[in-house]
């Protein structure tokens, strides 16, 4: 009989939304084949990102697990989970400490239905977010004068001096001829 539970042995976390860079995913490798059929066998709330193995930063509840029976499990983080992870990472935008992952008992099971045991402080290889955000849409409220910009990922507006309205122009075409340069420095972040 199978008496050895699955153990997490390595992992990679990608902070970049680009599919070629990993696409906001955590890829975990295990010591033996895990049962991912159906994928609902994965209890995603048992996966916790940590800065030092002790202080929890992000419980991955709400993330999406994918994979087939095998040695790897892929977890796609939500945008807010990705942002919180970047802040505690050893990549640009982070605090230099690096991300680790903790596992509660019962996150996955092997083919013999043995669940993983609790495990802490697994170091993750980090892939930096190197892709610039893309402007997806914009809207002007002519009654209030508020310009709302929507981007492909979270924009760091803390402190607000990181946003430079003077570098933005409003116009009817992609060139700057006839465009109006923004000068007001009132910036408000909205999730």
Language-model features, listed with the residues they occupy:
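Non-catalytic beta-sheet/beta-sandwich ligand-binding modules that flank or precede catalytic cores
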Residues: 1-191
């Amino acid at each position: 009989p199978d008496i050895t539970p699955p153990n997490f042995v390595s992992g990679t976390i990608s902070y970049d939304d680009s599919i070629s860079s990993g696409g906001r995913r955590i890829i975990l490798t295990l010591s033996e084949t895990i049962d991912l059929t159906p994928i609902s066998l994965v209890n995603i709330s048992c996966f916790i990102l940590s800065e030092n193995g002790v202080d929890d930063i992000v419980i991955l509840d709400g993330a999406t697990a994918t994979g087939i029976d095998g040695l790897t499990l892929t977890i796609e983080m939500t945008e807010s989970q990705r942002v919180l992870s970047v802040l505690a990472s050893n990549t640009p935008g982070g605090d230099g400490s690096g991300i680790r992952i903790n596992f509660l008992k019962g996150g996955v099971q092997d083919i013999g239905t043995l669940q993983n045991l609790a495990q802490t402080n697994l170091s993750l290889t980090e892939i930096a977010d190197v892709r610039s955000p893309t402007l997806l849409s914009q809207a002007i409220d002519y009654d209030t004068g508020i310009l709302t910009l929507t981007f492909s990922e979270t924009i760091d507006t803390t402190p607000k001096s990181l946003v430079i309205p003077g570098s933005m122009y409003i116009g009817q075409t992609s060139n700057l001829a006839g465009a109006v340069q923004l000068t007001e420095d009132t910036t408000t972040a909205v999730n």
